[in-house]
């Protein structure tokens, strides 16, 4: 089992998109009240007094949409300035990024992942669940701006949805050829949303829940060829290059290939729940309640340390326990991805 040194921190469960694999339109979502979110000060306290002493040094800010979090630039600056912070990154949908990219970069954000599931504005609108015009164009502007201000390499996350955007695999992979962009293809994972896209004829026709990474790789391999890359990130992606490309293509295969032995992370939800595994809901700790009840940082740290010792069992032996019935208590937007 890898050393666990990477914490994904969800800052907010709200989003300005309604991506169908994350928070589908029409679903009843109980948003966290603002007073139930971990505060700026509570987050910094947990990092300084609990996680960093336990060896965590890599932090990723997620959501919901993290750029909706009030004071996001100040929070980035405070986390980046912690002496133990080796890497600080963010996953965003990019819609608000054009006006914030420069400030985030100057505040100390090292890396950024931007969700881009389609190059077709109409398909993009379908996936994000919005009818408002120019959503794709604004997102694309955010991507270009982030690259221009210094986020180089830039990572683009693509959730491949059968019958919806799988016909764009080659076009999206091609983005890695001329710029130092890392394209990450992610297997569709219907956590908390068992009816995802069930009303779309394309999905019914496709007759499958996800497109396996090997199938995606083969499409790219047949067009250009693929070679293994010596660039490795902090996550579970298997990374390759199109020969001669400036960037890379990576594959995150949480549905078709078990990578529990490479897991190096935990997840902290916006309301303070620490989750050791994405695929099940065993062993979670309510850190916010402990903190607000006056429990000492030492005591909280001991509880997290114990969770770290049992994490391998949770990853391996209980890997599928969160979906025995096909139902998760939380959607991806609430977990933080």
Swiss-Prot record:
Entry keyword set: 4Fe-4S, GTP-binding, Iron, Iron-sulfur, Lyase, Metal-binding, Molybdenum cofactor biosynthesis, Nucleotide-binding, S-adenosyl-L-methionine
Catalyzed reactions: GTP + AH2 + S-adenosyl-L-methionine = (8S)-3',8-cyclo-7,8-dihydroguanosine 5'-triphosphate + 5'-deoxyadenosine + L-methionine + A + H(+)
Residues covered by the Radical SAM core domain: 1-226
Entry-linked Pfam families: Fer4_12, Mob_synth_C, Radical_SAM
Signal peptide: none
EC number(s) on file: 4.1.99.22
Record family assignment: Belongs to the radical SAM superfamily. MoaA family.
Protein name (database record): GTP 3',8-cyclase
Lineage: Bacteria, Bacillati, Cyanobacteriota, Cyanophyceae, Oscillatoriophycideae
Gene: moaA
